[in-house]
Amino acid sequence: MRNFFKAISSGSLLVVSLVHADVGREEELDEAVRQFAAKVEAVWKECLRRPDVHTTHDSDMCLLTMVRTANEKVELKYQEKMADALQMIEHPDRFSSYEQVPVLLKASQSQWKEYVKLDCEGIYQMSVAGTARSGYSLLCQYKHAVHRLRALDEWF
């Protein structure tokens, strides 16, 4: 009976250690995304302070730069994850050949792009009568890109 309790205690300690290590990884990844967003947003705010930025169109151009930077980061991270997924195929194990991983990652990325397009177009259409409609849509795209960075981190 004593050995049984020792085994349970040892197993619990191992599980807690693994969960703690994963939480540490999650926190590091979250922090990296937060730092990226803070840096990009600081550049956007600096752009808005420029003396030649006067109109809604001018401020939208600053926002568009932020969206492009975020989308480039998403594409880079996606390509890194795809390279990892393709490498998994080269090293199958007794559990899986991993052939579906790149297929699913590609589908996930494609569907994410379609979702962002529809979601942000909806926001644009809701505010179509106003001058800030493009800004709302661009901000929507930026927020989705930052969220996607975090989501791609889930693809080990």
Where are the predicted features?
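N-terminal alpha-helical modules
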Residues: 22-156
